[in-house]
């Protein structure tokens, strides 16, 4: 099956609340490979690769806020964006 890609930019109260750590666990649940990293503007960027159904479930979970301490304002989604192929999902520092 073909794997789809997406870049997500998540804004709100998403840094310093375990957002990247819990995003990594959600990624494992849905067999997502890619990365998650904090950006200097206070947002978080996620690069994700997975089969379409799993990618959509992952995006829905991110929209709900994977971390209990986070507050999502908006999730910008760029489906089909070029993403580096990876075998794992990693937190980038």
Swiss-Prot record:
It catalyses: an acyl phosphate + H2O = a carboxylate + phosphate + H(+). InterPro entries: Acylphosphatase, Acylphosphatase-like_dom, Acylphosphatase-like_dom_sf, Acylphosphatase_CS. The active site is at 20, 38. GO terms for molecular function: acylphosphatase activity. Residues 5-93 form the Acylphosphatase-like domain. The keyword Flavoprotein does not apply. Pfam families: Acylphosphatase (PF00708). Its EC number is 3.6.1.7. Keywords: Hydrolase. It comes from the Bacteria. Belongs to the acylphosphatase family. This is Acylphosphatase. It comes from Listeria monocytogenes serovar 1/2a (strain ATCC BAA-679 / EGD-e). The lineage of its organism: Bacteria, Bacillati, Bacillota, Bacilli, Bacillales.
